[in-house]
Amino acid sequence: MYICPVCKDKLKQIENSWRCRNGHCFDIARKGYVNLLTTAKHNPKTAGDNAEMVKARTEFLDKGYYRPLAEKLREVAGEVLKDNDSPVIIDSGCGEGFYTAELAKLGKARIFGIDISKHAVAHCMTRVHLAGITNCQFAAASSFELPFADKSADMVVSVFAPVSNDEYARVLKKGGALIVVSPSPRHLFELKAAVYDEPYENKPNVYGLNKFTLGSEVCFEYSAEIASQADIYSLFMMTPYFYKTSEEGMARLRALDDIEVTCGFMIQTYYKK
C-alpha cells in the first residue's frame, strides 16, 4: 500500500522499518507510525500542528461535542461502501484520529490515516491502542503527496483538511469515493456573534474537483452547549478565526463561560470519473 516518497517504488515492511528496492529506509517510530515526509519539502520536526495544539484539540473532541458528526460520517461512508467486503479507506489530514477511529468500526475496512504533523499521528497511535483498534495504520505525510500506490484505495475522507484533486484521483480506484466534510454556513455562528460586531456566515468551499463528480451533499446540523470557558477557548483555537481576532474580540471570548452553538457541517460525497 505504501510507496517510497523519494522514488515512488513500493515499500515493504521489514522488521521495524519500511524499505524499497532502491535502498530507501523509513523507520517505524516507537509510537508505531512511520514518517514518510521528505525533508526536501517539509521539516518533520515543525510541519503541521505542534504538540500543544494536538493536545487541546484532542481534549475538546474527547468531550463528545463532535461525536454526532463522527457517527454521521461513519453512516455516510458505510452506505457508500455497503457492497464492499474489505474496503481500503484513506483518512487524509486525519489529525489526532478522532474520525479515523470511528471509521475503523466499518466492518473489515483497512484504514490508513495520514497527517503532516508527526505529533498528530503519534497521538493517533495512542488513541487506537487504547481503544483496542487493530485495523488502522498511520504515517506522517502530506495530502498533496500521498504515500500510496495508484488506484489502491476505495475511499478517501477529508474532514476539515486540505483537498487535493490530483492526488485523490490518483490513489482512488475507478469509481472510488471521496467524502469531504467542511463547515456549513451557520457553523458556530453564535460564537462568532459573541466575539465579532458583524458576524458573517461561512462561504461554501470551492475545491476545483474536476476529476470527480458530486454524488450527494448533506447539511448536517445540531445544537451543542459548550459549558466551560476552557472548552469555548479550545473550540475557538480549532477555527481559522483564532488567528484573525483582535485583542478586543479575544477579551469577549475569554468572558464567555457558557454558550449554545450550532454545529453545522457539509458532507459531500464525490466519485472519481
Segments predicted by a language model, with ranges:
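Class I SAM-dependent methyltransferase Rossmann-like catalytic core
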Residues: 43, 48-68
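N-terminal auxiliary segments of SAM/dcSAM-dependent transferases
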Residues: 1-46
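A short glycine-rich, Lys/Arg-flanked "PGG" loop and its adjoining helix->strand segment in the class I
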Residues: 165-177
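Class I SAM-dependent methyltransferase SAM/SAH-binding core
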Residues: 88-91, 96-145
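Conserved Class I S-adenosyl-L-methionine
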Residues: 220-273
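Conserved alpha-helix/loop element of class I SAM-dependent methyltransferases that forms part
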Residues: 64-85
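A short acidic, Gly/Pro-enriched loop at the edge of an enzyme's catalytic core
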Residues: 144-155
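Conserved beta-strand signature within the Rossmann-like core of class I S-adenosyl-L-methionine
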Residues: 176-185
